[in-house]
């Protein structure tokens, strides 16, 4: 079972529907015990970093996420979740979770696309990924696939963690992580077949990791 973290920040239901479409057992929860028992955790979200951090702290879920990371449970951050796994955000000058080294910055005003046309903020719509390093989440997905983005801020994790980049006004990290902890700036649950395949790959990684842990006992 995958746990979808519920901290009143938006798109948990769309993630659940995507997983249910795949036949993946899942539950939306704010219960730390359910997080601990899950094969993996999805940390989605839309909204502002400061408000999200307040909501996490009020529910004790900031500590729960740190426990998930320390236990080595598979974890997937999506959009706002991707951003606040880092140490800080320029949005609300927020101190964020600090599970992953890096910062979140706002897109510059008056950006331009490569063809000279305006690149308004927020970045909203479909865009592709440029793979930087191999990632099991992208297995079986056409490299030309596009994913759905909605964001005004972009992430700058430790460069060694960058798995894919996207270009919109500037080139930014759109997928980062390693060893079962990943984060996507785009919305896989809203990205059609490529996004569903990514979520399915995450579940398969979680399932195999759980089986390996049981066999090791």
UniProtKB/Swiss-Prot annotation:
Residues 1-212 form the Glutamine amidotransferase type-1 domain. SMART domains: GATase_5 (SM01211). GO terms for biological process: L-histidine biosynthetic process. Pfam families: GATase (PF00117). Its main location: cytoplasm. The active site is at residues 79, 187, 189. Its EC number is 4.3.2.10, 3.5.1.2. GO terms for cellular component: cytoplasm. PROSITE patterns: GATASE_TYPE_1. The keyword Amino-acid biosynthesis applies. Signal peptide: none annotated. Keywords: Amino-acid biosynthesis, Cytoplasm, Glutamine amidotransferase, Histidine biosynthesis, Hydrolase, Lyase. IGPS catalyzes the conversion of PRFAR and glutamine to IGP, AICAR and glutamate. The HisH subunit catalyzes the hydrolysis of glutamine to glutamate and ammonia as part of the synthesis of IGP and AICAR. The resulting ammonia molecule is channeled to the active site of HisF. This is Imidazole glycerol phosphate synthase subunit HisH. The gene is hisH.
